[in-house]
Design a protein with these regions (language model features):
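Short beta-strand edge/turn micro-motifs at domain boundaries
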Residues: 97-122
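A solvent-exposed, acidic/Ser-Thr-rich amphipathic alpha-helical stretch
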Residues: 6, 19-73, 81
Length: 123
C-alpha cells in the first residue's frame, strides 16, 4: 500500500462509521486533535473519540479534497487536506468543514496514521 492508497482506504473506512474498519489504519501511539480542540492520545483514546462521533453523527458523509503531499519517504509521509462532513445530529441536519494535517508512519510494511490535526478553515 502506498501513502496515496492509505488516504483512499482511510476515507473509505471513515465513511463506514465503524471502528473495526478504521482500527487497522491507526498506529498504537496515534494522536488526533479534532477541530473543537480536543486531543486524543493513544489508540484506545482515539477509539473512544471516533466511536463517540460515529454514534453522534448519523448518516455521515465525509470527504477529503485538495491533498498536498508535504513529504513522502520510505517510513514517513505528511499531507495536508481539506475536509467536509455532513450528517444528522439529534434529528437535525449538520455539517462542517476545515483543514487537516496528517502524519503517516510505515510499520511492519503497513502505513498507519500516527498524527492528525483537524482545524477550522480560515475565512
Amino acid at each position: 500500500m502506498t501513502p496515496e492508497e492509505f488516504v483512499r482506504a482511510y476515507g473509505q473506512a471513515l465513511g463506514t462509521q465503524s471502528w473495526s474498519n478504521v482500527e487497522p489504519l491507526i498506529h498504537e501511539d496515534a494522536c488526533v486533535t479534532f477541530s473543537n480542540g480536543t486531543v486524543h492520545k493513544g489508540k484506545s483514546q482515539v477509539k473512544i473519540a471516533f466511536e463517540k462521533n460515529f454514534s453522534l453523527i448519523k448518516d455521515e458523509t465525509y470527504s477529503m479534497s485538495n491533498l498536498h503531499w508535504v513529504m513522502s519517504g520510505p517510513e514517513t509521509a505528511v499531507y495536508l487536506f481539506d475536509f467536509q462532513w455532513s450528517g444528522v445530529i439529534n434529528d437535525k441536519p449538520a455539517s462542517g468543514m476545515g483543514r487537516g494535517t496528517s502524519v503517516l508512519f510505515r510499520e511492519g510494511g503497513r502505513w498507519k496514521l500516527i498524527a492528525e490535526h483537524l482545524g477550522l478553515k480560515a475565512n
